[in-house]
Amino acid sequence: MSVKIVHAADFHLDSAFGALSAEQARQRRRESRELLTRLSNYVNQNGVDLVLLAGDLFDSDTTYRETLEALSEALGAMQARVFIAPGNHDPYSAKSPYATLSWPENVHVFTSKTVERVELPELQCAVYGAAFTAPVQDESLLAGFRAPEDDFIHLMVLHGDISATESRYDPLTKGQIKESGIDYLALGHTHQFGGFLREGQTTYAYSGCPEGRGFDELGEKGILTGTVERGKAELSFVPFARRRYEVLNVDVTGRSAENALRAALPDATVRDIYRIIFTGETDERGLDLKSIEEQFAPDFFHLELRDETRIGEDVWARAQEDSLRGLFLRELRTKFDVASSDDERAKISLAARFGLAALDGCDL
């Protein structure tokens, strides 16, 4: 016998989206609520038995009422049992939405740091979980746990951190996972899907977040789904994000920034959020970022441009001129040659551009 599950985590509902305009941020929050409905439809259309939500559904303890209502409605519409393990951003407390909201009957919220077992005899399955009850959890919630040796399929949902033993966010170890006797461990906290891993008989994974919220959450985001049986889990990653965050480096050496950017862009970007970093060499005028942004902004949901170019060698060659320009360039080139970092060299190049523009009576 097997059960079909969906594993998701780290929704961070009602995030601020501070890098976007106020209207774009409002739209992204609306889309985050719409994500819940899309997830509910996916669960029902694909015959899912169990939904495991591994914490940080909320970004903070300040959540819009319409978001709570949308979440409750979406989860209640799922023709599946739903299990939630609160995380460090949304710990369980008497004042948290997990305690104050009237949740649908098919939703179970784990409320204690002690692992709880919920039996589902009709599925021959047991679901285990535990909760953050404060923003930090110094000790592993999995320490000392082992599932009984019975005929049930054993699933667990936790918010925790395997990456560092000194973590303050439920520091899990591979040894604890191996000794747990769990068939599938659904984890939250890390926002990047890192593949399916195995310790002993336990398959475990981080689903990552279903939608990126910033340039530290790049690329495709989604959920995990598949089947679990005794000692075996077969799941796959399902892309679910409406928009992606991407960072693109564009070398402008020997060509205009506009042509270089056109050549580097993929076909479809209008739904996505991009940071373009221009690199390489330019002439003394540098880049007109405002003009580039005006030209390309309609091709994106949001566009951010960064100039990390440097003055070309042909400009520095003019340091040999017997003029004020030459003297200025010689002074800066001396500093440029002994600079200890790319960031310092970039600042010197920028100073050279502004200085040359001032000498020529031009604006940048």
What are these regions (language model features)?
Residues 50, 59-205, 209-220:
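His/Asp/Glu-rich metal-coordinating catalytic cores
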